Swiss-Prot record:
Main subcellular location: plastid
GO cellular component: chloroplast thylakoid membrane; photosystem II
Any Gene Ontology biological process: photosynthesis, light reaction
Organism: Cyanidium caldarium (Red alga)
Name the record gives this protein: Photosystem II extrinsic protein V
Amino acid sequence: MFVKMIGWLVLFLFAHQTWAIEVAKDTNGGILNIAPEQLKRGKRLFNSHCSSCHVGGITKTNPNIGLDLESLSLATPPRNNLDALVDYMKNPTTYDGSESIAQIHPSIASSDIFPKMRDLSEDDLYAIAAHILTQPQIQAEKWGGGKIYYTKRSM
């Protein structure tokens, strides 16, 4: 009887553990565990604020630059961590980092032009960034891979 109770206790404890995905927090090697609730929130916010131009991790206005980790890491400065991606959502720059593009890319800096950005808090920006950075772990090459992964191939 005692062994059976221990078995149920172990089952109960493990059944209620939640999984998390690791994401780079900054350029210093900091790592954060992103909980499922945060990912859901980030996905919802991404879909309502970003997906009209970035569906599936692509960039409709420039297909050469996606939201995949390779593209983000090759930007100047690199945008492959939470802090850097949130900074971009506040003050976007060109891929080489030389000019502000706040007048043409939705951002907190241009919320007067892009009203959807007005209601986003700092926590919201981090949730969106977490969604973007975890998608390569969830969708692999489909995230940012473009239409070759989403079109039906005929035989």
